[in-house]
Amino acid sequence: MANFNKVSVANDARTELHDKLQLTGAEVSVNNLPAGASVPFVHYHKKNEEIYFVTAGKGKAVIDGETVELKAGDWLRISPAGRRQFFAAADEGISYICIQVRENSLEEYTADDAGIEQ
């Protein structure tokens, strides 16, 4: 396993993968809010943008005072300065993955960063 790490994630309220996967360029968390619950604080970041993928359920994010409805299959990017808080719907929980990376750090991606072996 010199070139990869693998973990299994339980259905906990929040699991951070930085240490579990020995990540060096990102933080990834798996989040589950039950119906009617919310993240108990508003937050922002100094340097990192966040990308969210809703894997199940529904809810909303309030970003800089604006409500964004969320459902399974939605993707959402929030810049570092965006003040955000997440809420599950009253009648259904929400599960999502959050990927946190330094804003404007991506120099190459997809084919530009790949080496193809024949």
Residue ranges of model-derived segments:
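Conserved hydrophobic/aromatic positions in well-ordered beta-strands
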Residues: 29-31, 97
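Histidine-centered metal-chelating micro-motifs
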Residues: 38-39, 60, 76, 81-86
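Short, conserved beta-strand element in jelly-roll/cupin
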Residues: 32-33, 44-62
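Short strand-coil-strand connectors
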Residues: 24, 62-66
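Ligand-binding loop in jelly-roll beta-barrel domains
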Residues: 80-106
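A short, N-terminal "cap"/entry segment at the start of jelly-roll beta-barrel domains
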Residues: 1-26, 34-35, 107-118
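Short acidic-glycine-tyrosine-enriched beta hairpin
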Residues: 65-81
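Short histidine-centered beta-strand/loop micro-motifs
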Residues: 19-20, 40-45, 87-89, 108-109
